[in-house]
Amino acid sequence: MARYLGPKAKLSRREGTDLFLKSARRSIADKAKFDSKPGQHGRTSGARTSDYGLQLREKQKVKRMYGVLEKQFRRYFEAAERLKGNTGANLLGLLECRLDNVVYRMGFGSTRAEARQLVSHKAITVNGQSVNIASYLVKAGDVVAVREKSKKQARIVEALQLAQQVGMPVWVEVNADKVEGTFKKVPDRDEFGADINESLIVELYSR
């Protein structure tokens, strides 16, 4: 499956929630009504969605939110199953450890897609070493930084300013002057309030 390159607002409307695919500088809420589906008239049928349909939709929503394709998403789920604890929470924890997501959480990119681009363009280092793999899993204590030659990019400066206004997640510690941050720990499930029902994904893959 190829990566989706179409309108981001359309995806959020399809899932009925903000997937955080667009910068908060231009809120997607201004362009899409999440309670209506894509199309001229949205969904007209009041038919009940099957359990399988709900499970599949939840998986699609999380994949789109984190920008992960099916094969890789399945690998994350299998890895989550091997870890101790709740499989659904483990799955989200692994997704939160992706380098592109950590760059986004630290405010260096205004969206995960923008953060992924910074990683692929070699603008990001981990513990002083350049890393250009978006799926690289960041560990507790790792220092993630923007390379010196990229620190003055307008999009990075603006994204960081916005993140400072909104507030940083508790599991990262960011030095805005150095444009670097420390990934303190894998976040607990209750620390990020994403509109996700991960148990539906576990049920889907357990069928």
UniProtKB/Swiss-Prot annotation:
NCBIfam families: PRK05327.1, rpsD_bact. The keyword RNA-binding applies. SUPFAM superfamilies: Alpha-L RNA-binding motif. Pfam families: Ribosomal_S4, S4. Residues 97-157 form the S4 RNA-binding domain. Belongs to the universal ribosomal protein uS4 family. GO terms for cellular component: small ribosomal subunit. Residues 31-53 are annotated as: Disordered. InterPro entries: Ribosomal_uS4 (IPR022801), Ribosomal_uS4_bac-type (IPR005709), Ribosomal_uS4_CS (IPR018079), Ribosomal_uS4_N (IPR001912), S4_RNA-bd (IPR002942), S4_RNA-bd_sf (IPR036986). It comes from the Bacteria. Keywords: Ribonucleoprotein, Ribosomal protein, RNA-binding, rRNA-binding. Part of the 30S ribosomal subunit. Contacts protein S5. The interaction surface between S4 and S5 is involved in control of translational fidelity. This is Small ribosomal subunit protein uS4. The keyword rRNA-binding applies. One of its GO terms (molecular function) is rRNA binding. One of the primary rRNA binding proteins, it binds directly to 16S rRNA where it nucleates assembly of the body of the 30S subunit. CDD domains: S4. It comes from Acidovorax ebreus (strain TPSY). One of its GO terms (biological process) is translation.
